[in-house]
Amino acid sequence: MAKVFAYNMPQATENLPKKEGKKTRITKTTPPPQKVIPPLSQMAKLNFAEETLPPGYVKAERKMKKVLATFNHRKIQTNRLHAKAAEWFPVIEPILAAYGIPEDFKYVPLVESGLNAGVSPKGAAGFWQFMPGTARTYGLKVNSKVDERKNLRKSTIAACKYIKELYGIFDSWTLVAAAYNVGDNHMKKQINRQKQDNYFKMRLNSETGGYVYKLISMKAIVEDPARYGFKAPKSVLAFHKPLSATNVE
């Protein structure tokens, strides 16, 4: 894009007396830096747990581009998530590895709760947004005195148990992520009804249908923030007020 200069063109002043007055300032206007969204041809390289978009499947590639652009417009919020990721991923990553869960699942609590331990209107709570019944099923205490869904280490262990069980059902990490969002029974019904087991080609509700795309977008931006016009995590740590140490003990 050409650079724009705003200024007044001087007129010929031959044999005319010079006029006194304020000097005209030359104002240089440059366009704001553009955030780089990969072209459609490169979308297939993006992946979740090594599962990529179907090659040449333009519908999925366009959806991926749209979700990436949405994250770019949420710059301040995403910068805060960068800060939280820098602090809490070191707690989550070794637990995922111990259970044989792909590291990309660390982005689930980032998308689910923004790595906050709050309670949703539906009753889901904690970093991994467990419902009370599911939390108890996978070993978490949830009662009037204690809620281990808000403990990052314990809730991550519970999430790994659940995710591993889901993989035994679906044999696909993208389907596992979708089932984590909407429930395994719903996903099984959709797979049987549509006779389709490729997440990217399935017709799902808007939240679940965009869920894995959000995970991939968050992964892309956190791993390479400069490419998408964001600051590096260390430079935005001031946005994040650390949680109590009891959340990880």
Where are the language model's segments positioned?
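Catalytic and substrate-binding regions of cell-wall glycan-acting enzymes that process beta-1,4-linked
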Residues: 27-71, 126-129, 133, 143, ...
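An acidic, Gly/Ser/Thr/Pro-rich helix-cap/linker signature
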Residues: 1-99, 230, 234
